[in-house]
Amino acid sequence: QDRVEKLQDGYDWSIVRTFCLRVIRCIDNLENRIDRLNENDESVLQLEEVRDELLFALESSGVEQYRPDIGTDYRGQEKLAEAIKEKETTREPSQVGTIAKVVRPGYRYVTDEDSYKVVRTAQVKLFG
């Protein structure tokens, strides 16, 4: 019985995660279009409203967007963020291996107050 429940939970999570990733892809596409348009363009406001509605739909379902803090050590955050190969140059040795920029936000499903399941890892650029 426990095994069946675990399989069912895994299957249900797979369906939920796949759906969330499709919504997140729409949010990413809206962000890219917003970034390419002139901020004075009227369509920017409309695109931002659609993006915000999609974010609200995720958040009200327990999925939150997160961005790792700039300047924090990347070590220990590998489950929440993936580092891209390109590095940000620095002359400060203490900055090497810390997060320089969030390239793409991550999303996680909050299961209770202290735990979550990662829907999509954030992408970060490190100082190197």
Please place each PLM-identified region on the residue numbering.
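Extended, amphipathic alpha-helical stalk segments that mediate dimerization
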Residues: Q1-W13, T18-N40, L45-G128
